[in-house]
Amino acid sequence: MSKALLRFVRLSPTKARLIARQIQGMNAELAIASLEFTPNKAARVLSKVVASAVANGSLDAKSALIVSCRVDAGPVLRRSIPRAKGRATAIRKPTSHVFVEVAEGKEMKSSKSHKKNQAEGK
């Protein structure tokens, strides 16, 4: 089992968790391919972390399985923006810590279409 950790990335943890849940349990090669076509900043970041985890363990991406994909909240950068009448309001710029574990395995996450095809006997 190999791991990769990316800390203090300027990315909202709630938005990144949406993508992280989708790739958990998937084959690493399939996950990287699907993330490549996802129009999201979190997808680009997660793709690089998954590739790094595969490389850290000297694994083959075709046989690697994403065991765990976790996105934790990092510190929040606070900035201020000037407003009317001399006031200023805060802007929160959240950061995240992305953690991916990859292990040797050949099972793939079953999708709805795959289950449907199996039920029909295709």
UniProtKB/Swiss-Prot annotation:
Record keyword Ribonucleoprotein present: yes
Entry's Gene Ontology molecular function annotations: rRNA binding; structural constituent of ribosome
Cross-referenced SUPFAM superfamilies: Ribosomal protein L22 (SSF54843)
Keywords from the UniProt entry: Ribonucleoprotein, Ribosomal protein, RNA-binding, rRNA-binding
PANTHER family noted in UniProt: CHLOROPLAST 50S RIBOSOMAL PROTEIN L22-RELATED (PTHR13501), LARGE RIBOSOMAL SUBUNIT PROTEIN UL22M (PTHR13501:SF8)
Subunit structure: Part of the 50S ribosomal subunit.
Protein name as it appears in the record: Large ribosomal subunit protein uL22
Species assigned in the record: Helicobacter pylori (strain ATCC 700392 / 26695)
